[in-house]
């Protein structure tokens, strides 16, 4: 009986668990940088047909170094034979084969992009209901992440600018290669100028510096980054004229603003005195409550200036003309000009004047 019971227990005992199977191999990811290249060349593909014409290829890759003939040779070499169009996938494969030391860099960029997006999504969901301490930590981590990325970007931009300058070098007019124009805003121009300044912390091909910057250099880069942010803020507050579509204007004293343009030609021997008087006048005029904006431009080829004044209305401008500062400036004009000044006024709808205070 005991044997029968033991046999019954053995028969109903659950089978021993199977040893865990090794995880199935993850699908092979594309080569490093492949996804990044796909996104880049998708932007170059203006008609979104998966191919680049030579015109699209030239517009995107022209850098002022390779001539149109050299670009055409590269265009044909990627595909292996002359063709009118080049598939973006073949272009991705071509660059993937030439990554060299940048292969881990691009792989890290792809991983970084995913990590940043994940962190941003989590922050968006959890920040509002987090404690004040956790919110402080999140802001600190985000700020430091931005600083580190900006420092890396500054180093890369310095290296890129140095290589471009060396590749272009001094060229004669016959050798100069034109780059197709691309729209670039004032913000890009401001940052480009700052990049030229930051290059003084120097990067050059063959340098043994592997990124171990001194404390002074790091502080210098941080100051440049802060200056970039300040430029962005100032540019956002710059006044601009912007018409409203199909706007119905109402007549009244405040329906239009006045723009006064004054062109002057200064005698060479009086430039210093005139410039001092002009600066005083601009400072005084800009401080007036009814003056929207005032600026002066100097022509480089001659001692000529153009002064622009934007006023809320004509009455405000005429009252300003009678002020002691304005009359003193007019006397300066009489004493220091080579020829009589030219004054032009024009009216704009007041609703066109938009001040962006964000």
Swiss-Prot record:
GO CC annotations on file: cytoplasm; endoplasmic reticulum; Golgi cis cisterna
Domain EF-hand span(s) in chain numbering: 32-67
Start-end of Polar residues biased regions: 197-215
Residue stretches making up the ABM domain: 258-347
GO molecular function, one term: calcium ion binding
A Pfam family it matches: EF-hand_5
Binding site for Ca(2+): 45, 47, 49, 51, 56
InterPro entries recorded: ABM_dom (IPR007138), Dimeric_a/b-barrel (IPR011008), EF-hand-dom_pair (IPR011992), EF_Hand_1_Ca_BS (IPR018247), EF_hand_dom (IPR002048), NECAB1/2/3 (IPR039862)
Ranges for region Disordered: 159-215
GO biological process: regulation of amyloid precursor protein biosynthetic process
Subcellular location(s) of the protein: Golgi apparatus
Biased composition range(s): Basic and acidic residues: 171-181
Coiled-coil blocks: none
PANTHER family attached to this UniProt entry: EF-HAND DOMAIN-CONTAINING PROTEIN, N-TERMINAL EF-HAND CALCIUM-BINDING PROTEIN 3
Subunit structure: Interacts with the N-terminal domain of APBA2. Interacts with NEK2. Interacts with APBA3; APBA3 seems to mediate the interaction between NECAB3 and HIF1AN.
Annotated function: Inhibits the interaction of APBA2 with amyloid-beta precursor protein (APP), and hence allows formation of amyloid-beta. May enhance the activity of HIF1A and thus promote glycolysis under normoxic conditions; the function requires its ABM domain and may implicate the stabilization of the interaction between HIF1AN and APBA3.
Official protein name in the record: N-terminal EF-hand calcium-binding protein 3
Species the sequence originates in: Bos taurus
Biological classification of the source: Eukaryota, Metazoa, Chordata, Craniata, Vertebrata
UniProt gene name: NECAB3
């Amino acid at each position: 009986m005991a044997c029968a019971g033991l046999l019954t227990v053995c028969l109903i005992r659950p089978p021993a668990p199977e040893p865990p199977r090794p995880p199935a191999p993850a699908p092979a990811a594309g080569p490093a940088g492949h996804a990044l290249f796909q996104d880049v060349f998708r932007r170059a593909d203006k008609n979104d047909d998966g191919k680049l014409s030579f015109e699209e290829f030239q517009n995107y890759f022209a850098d002022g170094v390779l001539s149109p003939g050299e670009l055409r040779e590269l265009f044909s070499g990627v595909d292996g034979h002359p063709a009118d169009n080049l598939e973006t996938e073949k272009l991705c494969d071509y660059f993937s084969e030439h990554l060299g030391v940048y292969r881990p860099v691009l792989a890290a960029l792809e991983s970084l992009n995913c990590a940043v997006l994940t962190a941003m999504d989590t922050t968006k969901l959890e920040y509002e209901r987090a404690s004040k301490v956790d919110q402080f930590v999140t802001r600190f981590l985000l700020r430091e992440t931005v600083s580190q990325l900006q420092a890396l970007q500054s180093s890369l931009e310095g290296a890129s600018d140095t290589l471009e300058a060396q590749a272009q070098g001094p060229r004669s007019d016959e050798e100069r290669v034109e780059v197709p124009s691309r729209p670039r805003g004032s913000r890009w121009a401001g940052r480009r100028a700052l990049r030229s300044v930051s290059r003084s912390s120097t990067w050059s091909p063959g340098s043994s510096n592997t990124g171990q910057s001194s404390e002074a250099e790091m502080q210098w880069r941080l100051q440049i980054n802060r200056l970039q942010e300040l430029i962005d803020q100032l540019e956002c507050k710059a006044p601009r004229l912007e018409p409203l579509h199909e706007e119905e204007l109402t007549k009244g004293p405040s329906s239009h603003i006045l723009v006064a343009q004054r062109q002057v030609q200064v005698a060479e021997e009086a430039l210093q005195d005139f410039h001092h008087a002009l600066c005083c006048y601009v400072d005084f005029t800009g401080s007036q409550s009814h003056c929207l904006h005032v600026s002066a431009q100097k022509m480089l080829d001659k001692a000529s200036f153009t002064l622009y004044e934007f006023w809320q209305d004509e009455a405000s401008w005429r009252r300003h003309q009678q002020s002691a500062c304005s009359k003193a400036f007019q006397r300066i004009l009489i004493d220091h000009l080579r020829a009589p000044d030219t004054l032009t006024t024009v009216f704009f709808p007041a609703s066109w004047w938009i001040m962006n205070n964000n």
